[in-house]
Amino acid sequence: MSINAPKFKFLGLTAIALIAGLLYTQIDYGQDAMQSTKITEPVIENKDNTNPAGYEKVTLPLSDVENIDGQIEDYLLDMWPIMSEQEVQAIIGSKDISKKLVNDTLGHVEFSLTINVPSHYLDPAPKMLWELNIPEFTSRIYQIYNNDTILITVWPNVVGAPGTKTYTGLYNIFKLRNWPTWKDPESDPLEPGTPPGPGNPLGLFAAHYDENSLRYFHGTNKNGLLKNEYRALSHGCVRNDNGNIDKMKRFIVKRMITSQDISWWANSKKSMVYNFTEEEKENFPVRIKYKTFDIGSDSYGDYIIFFKDVYGYARGNKWSKFDREELMTFSTVENITAEYKAIHKPNQFQLPDDKLIPIVESLISDHKDYEKYYFADLVAGTQSETGK
């Protein structure tokens, strides 16, 4: 026994050292894995890289492997709250999950999750454009990135009624109000205003853009009005669905405010005001236009849609001194054909004037507002009528 004791002692020490080494290795891998989840690795186009240009590969931590899509969605909407559902699903579709056996003896496995994210979403100081078309009652939110204008999301609005118009113009977001109070400007000055909360006409958040008039973007206490086809109903401000204005609030306080950290506003119900710095103003321009038609394309093809001339400007009604005439475009043959040709270049499918102009003239005289008319159907109808 005494002869073999050192041997067993040696083996015991060796086993302890081996286990300690394995534990150390496991911890070391774990630390590396934690660090790797905080890094975004730029995608470089080469023959060995299948990622498309303009994307970055982002590595995310995996809290569990049961709800991976939900974890990706939470990450994306925390990073970019106004990201569209379509974009979220497209990024989720790029996910790549791999596993690595860290330790054979203990069977420890690490999972790695990567997604391909369009590079513009990772811009640390994004520049945005909020565009509203009054007769369409619709906002389009764009990001200005590398001299390109990228559509981020689209949502409905309520705009000023004909007696209390929303003005056209070029502006910048300059002030935020969280849980604002509201007082009817036409009410008795001695009457108290409406306190903050769900019953407030401004909703839960307001973003001011016009320093010359009491007009701004805000939420609403009448979300149902946003489902109406005709939505020129406000006192001049631009109402937004409460869900959409909350997304915008979260985006602004997390991504647009760079002079200080007010990200904690995202979940706050306190009444607060923040004034933009000059640089922050420049990074969030606003364009409000008055255009009574649009030419677009969807899965069914190219179309034209007309919008009601809600303020009668196309019929000669006078606009305000605050309005900008250059931001008004009416449904004339000249305007429609010019936009059609700008979109459909000569080397693409383009209707010749002898087909396009009669179609446009007919539509101007007889159409239903807010209904899409597809050019392929219009051409087929014209050919049927003429026997061609």
Which stretches of residues belong to each language-model region?
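N-terminal pre-domains immediately preceding structured catalytic cores
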Residues: 19-238, 242-388
